[in-house]
Amino acid sequence: MIDKKLLLQDFEMVALSLKKRNHAMDDGLERLREVITHYKKQLIELEGLQAFQNKVSKEFGIKMAQKADTSDLKKELESNKIKLNELSKSVSELEQQIDLKLSIIPNLVDEKTPLGANEEDNIEIKKILTPRVFNFKPKEHFELAQQNGWIDFESGVKLAKSRFSVIRGFGAKIYRALIYLMLDFNEKNGFEIIYTPALVNEKMLFGTGQLPKFKEDVFKIENENLYLIPTAEVTLTNLYNDTIISVENLPIKMTAHTPCFRSEAGSAGKDTRGMIRQHQFDKVELVAITHPKESDAMQECMLESASEILRALELPHRFVQLCSGDLGFSASNTIDIEVWLPGQNCYREISSVSNTRDFQARRAKIRFKENQKNQLAHTLNGSSLAVGRTMVALMENHQQADGSIHIPKALEKYL
């Protein structure tokens, strides 16, 4: 959540940031500024009434002790109390109204994020490893998976519906091996391995920004205040929800393997075959909580950790800087890692590493104490990596002419 003070102190900057994102609010932002201004005035008035009430209460106590006449003071206290209660209710309602409006405004765009309308305006930063030249036409992963008996798409539909899969046999062993390899690499790079619930309450999804704006994208448990997590970013970040961290304990670096659940609202017709876009998938996530001065360096650290895994698996990939129009809701700056898929003859996203600055920390009340002062931390998140998409890339890049799959040396010890 952005700081409401910014709307009063630097309204034009906030408006420009939303314009960069193509986030239309019409005159809603101006109205919100007016509401915040009115709220501030009422808050000052409320504080004045509270101070007056305290002052008169003390006078009342002194006169009572002296057994003096207190009838006038009593009337004054009762009259002021009515005003105080009415104004307190008004201030509380305004605060709720402001917080609701602020909760659906996306993060401010980082100055390092280039201006652009959509993914077409994203900028390639660098390529790592050269794509292999095949002497045969490479197949797509779903063809290879079915040929080798690794993935049963029909059973996934039977058990649930479309966009679910069953992984079995040697394919399941590879899938498990990838998870272990990812966790080991992340742990080596200083990230603590954590296992968390796959269900969270509404407050946690608000903290990381999925709610209230993206309610259609998550699965809710009927008659419960519980949701299936769309990513371990939610659980790892919110481990420190409403927490004050000693500055000596920063940075906090965490990694988790979890199932992830997404409704994929708005994805009809996209990636209908295979494992690229599923309602349920596994992901190994990285989350970091840092001092504001250290978040840029942490983003580079997280990118390197994810890239190291891809290099170990001999998978060509590239870094792509997302433009302002393609940023996620909570992100201030995002760099994607896209892996080469020869079967599709293109690069596809396998990781997004985002710096949210203090946006999530303000929503989730994640603070740190430095020099006896509480400050908002910075939070970052990124995949390291999406397991299904890594398996897709492994099959397509390491396929042989007969349809068999070469296993990279780094993965052998996990099989």
Curated annotation (Swiss-Prot):
GO terms for molecular function: ATP binding; serine-tRNA ligase activity. ATP binds at R262, S263, E264, E349, I350, S351, S352. It is found in: Cytoplasm. Keywords: Aminoacyl-tRNA synthetase, ATP-binding, Cytoplasm, Ligase, Nucleotide-binding, Protein biosynthesis. It catalyses: tRNA(Ser) + L-serine + ATP = L-seryl-tRNA(Ser) + AMP + diphosphate + H(+); tRNA(Sec) + L-serine + ATP = L-seryl-tRNA(Sec) + AMP + diphosphate + H(+). It comes from the Bacteria. Transmembrane segments: none annotated. L-serine binds at T231, A232, E233, E285, S383. The keyword Amino-acid biosynthesis does not apply. Catalyzes the attachment of serine to tRNA(Ser). Is also able to aminoacylate tRNA(Sec) with serine, to form the misacylated tRNA L-seryl-tRNA(Sec), which will be further converted into selenocysteinyl-tRNA(Sec). NCBIfam families: serS. Belongs to the class-II aminoacyl-tRNA synthetase family. Type-1 seryl-tRNA synthetase subfamily. This is Serine--tRNA ligase. It comes from Helicobacter pylori (strain P12). The lineage of its organism: Bacteria, Pseudomonadati, Campylobacterota, Epsilonproteobacteria, Campylobacterales. The gene is serS.
